Amino acid sequence: MGNGLSDQTSILSSLPSFQSFHIVILGLDCAGKTTVLYRLQFNEFVNTVPTKGFNTEKIKVTLGNSKTVTFHFWDVGGQEKLRPLWKSYTRCTDGIVFVVDSVDVERMEEAKTELHKITRISENQGVPVLIVANKQDLRNSLSLSEIEKLLAMGELSSSTPWHLQPTCAIIGDGLKEGLEKLHDMIIKRRKMLRQQKKKR
């Protein structure tokens, strides 16, 4: 699921085998942001407590094409009082990972509001967004099409590339696939920005 980014290109093959990307992990409190971060770092479940400020980790990931990239993740607390700080972390970011709890139907409207708010900030125009639909292993989780509708993904700016990825952060299902999609979107954006600079 996404807006026109499903085509497979050979962009990755022309890149150096080592790259670093600044990624911000956002989402409501209790969505599973920190669980996502430490599952990626340690490849195991780490019991976490609510994030009061932020966690930051540099994590090397080998993508499907055997290229190793470093993601510098900033996992920012999702409590309401911390959300005004989100824009400070997204300044100059390469990509945003927005984690939603696939079971928490009652807070999906709140998640939608925050997602649209952060993507509409001028500095974030065009920044790729990976929406992580977490807790997909639970029986009462919403389907991807339901989440896409509730988050009003079709109403995001046409300049904002996005991908909705089903995951289970506790066991790691879907996380690497999501990162590969995010990486693809970032590379496409960088290439587009370079082409725009050449035309000036």
UniProtKB/Swiss-Prot annotation:
| Cell location | Cell membrane; Cytoplasm; Nucleus, Nucleolus
Gene Ontology biological-process annotations: brown fat cell differentiation; intracellular protein transport; vesicle-mediated transport
**Principal subcellular localization:** membrane
Lipidated positions per record (N-myristoyl glycine): G2
Assigned GO CC terms? cytoplasm; nucleolus; nucleus; plasma membrane
User: Short name of one Pfam family for this protein?
Assistant: Arf
Q: Does GTP-binding count among this protein's keywords?
A: yes
Can you tell me which residues bind GTP? 27-34, 75-79, 134-137
Query: Entry's PROSITE patterns?
Result: ARF
Record carries keyword Phosphoprotein: no
Q: Provide the GO MF annotations for this entry.
A: GTP binding; GTPase activity
Could you tell me in which tissues this protein is expressed?
A: Expressed strongly in testis and liver. Expressed slightly in heart, spleen, lung and kidney.
Reported modifications of this chain: Myristoylated.
Kindly give the InterPro entries that the UniProt entry links to this protein.
P-loop_NTPase (IPR027417), Small_GTP-bd (IPR005225), Small_GTPase_ARF (IPR024156), Small_GTPase_ARF/SAR (IPR006689)
Task: Write out the entry's keywords from A to Z.
Answer: Cell membrane, Cytoplasm, GTP-binding, Lipoprotein, Membrane, Myristate, Nucleotide-binding, Nucleus
Q: Domain of life, per the record?
A: Eukaryota
| Role of this protein | Small GTP-binding protein which cycles between an inactive GDP-bound and an active GTP-bound form, and the rate of cycling is regulated by guanine nucleotide exchange factors (GEF) and GTPase-activating proteins (GAP). GTP-binding protein that does not act as an allosteric activator of the cholera toxin catalytic subunit. Recruits CYTH1, CYTH2, CYTH3 and CYTH4 to the plasma membrane in GDP-bound form.
What NCBIfam families has UniProt attached to this entry? small_GTP
Q: How does it assemble?
A: Interacts with CYTH2. Interacts with KPNA2; the interaction is direct. Does not interact with ARL4A.
Q: Which family does it belong to?
A: Belongs to the small GTPase superfamily. Arf family.
- What is the designated name of this protein? ADP-ribosylation factor-like protein 4A
Native organism: Rattus norvegicus
Q: Lineage of the source organism?
A: Eukaryota, Metazoa, Chordata, Craniata, Vertebrata
